[in-house]
Amino acid sequence: MADGMEAHSMAAPRSLRIAWFSDLTDAGGISSYCSKLLLPILANEHQIELFSESFATTLLGLPNHHYLKAYSCHREQPFDIFFYQLEDGAAARFVRTYLGIMPGITWVHDLFLSDLGAEATHNSPWEHSIEQFYNNSLPFAARSIARHNAWPRAYREVALSPITLFSSQYGLKEISTMISSRIEAEPGAHRAEYLAIPISCAGISAPPQHAPLSFATVCRPGLEGRAYKFLPALKGLGSPWQLTWLIDPAEQSAAEILIREFSVVDQVTLVLGRSPEKWSEILSSSHVAIHLSSTALGHLGPYLQLALGSGRLAIVSDTFHGEEIPSTSAFKITPGIHEYAQISRVFEAIQKTQLRTLTLPAQKMVASENDPARIALCLSKIFQESAPQMAIIMQRWQALYQSAHVALLAEVKELTSSSELNEIDVYKELLSQSFLELGWSS
């Protein structure tokens, strides 16, 4: 009897229905890379359906729907958790839009964004919507008011996410004091924490130790990528060296201008199409990875972690995302007037000594922090712990959602019903059926 009771108390957590919103098409995207590593593990524990911009019925071996079908799928068989991966770029813009329609758990890869996004995103009265979440009797915000942000940040997306995960310690630190109000099941229940990006170093082989010193970088050719600092430092090395520079096609012209300016055309090879897979191939023939980036935009992962995890020496800027990297795991450079001199000294030290073998601390760090099985276990635990809170929030949000439908339907009906100006009743003949398909009732 006692054994039976103990077995019952240790029963496995129930399988949850997860709506997984993520860009799955961008080969160089963080969301796509994380999904490929985590979904095969998480799908063994939970019922996961993908929502993307693709119309394919299956992606990564799981059911896939176009994201505009999410509401109807949820109505037919409700999801326990809506999960979003938020990153910069046009390919993931739909995620920014939809998480304002249905709150959930958001994994923020990029807190600072390069564009304002769609009209529904940057002109959203999200702060007023949060007030309505707690007081459904408030009137809806006027749509005629422009609410443009001076600089695109994911404040709206974080505030509308009861549980927010950050793949960068820098992003988590920056957001802690920036948002005063957010959606919560109860005061103080909002959860924000760091969740590392998973990586796989499988297939990355060790480079020849006796070959000429070989460098690799994914730095962008703009000022923030610091190429105008590290290219002349490389040129100053006395012995032979090679650099493989992985860039996006749109960056090719700027990169070519730089390598001509510093007369290193013969030593630099440009590879087009930045992606973790191509980076892994490049690392197999590289000794040192250059990750000098001095900007809040973008992310060092998974490229830096792949370099460290595969035993490469790495050089990072000691600002923004580079601050979180321990000095025992990478050479850290301070941007500024002494930056070139620091980079040159590091290159010379690597060239003259056996420093390229001193990578064990970094490998241990990555093996522990970025293991896909560990990340999947952490994420599954977050899903389980958050499910009761999300059920409360969903119920309250649904009431607000229906109120918005009623208000919009009344406005549309008034504007489109038959009159001397309309030969047909537009609402009755054209719109009512569409609204019913969306789950809206008049």
Descriptions of predicted regions:
Residues 19, 165, 207-225, 244:
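Conserved donor-binding/catalytic core segment of Leloir-type glycosyltransferases
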Residues 32, 222-236:
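A conserved mid-protein helix/loop that constitutes part of the nucleotide-sugar donor-binding site
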Residues 55, 242-255:
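Glycosyltransferase donor-sugar binding loop
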Residues 147-191:
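A short, active-site helix/loop in glycosyltransferases that binds the activated sugar's phosphate group
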Residues 255-274:
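Nucleotide-activated donor-binding/catalytic signature segment of Leloir-type glycosyltransferases, i.e.
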Residues 283-298, 312:
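Acidic donor-binding loop of glycosyltransferase active sites
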Residues 360-442:
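C-terminal amphipathic helix plus adjacent low-complexity
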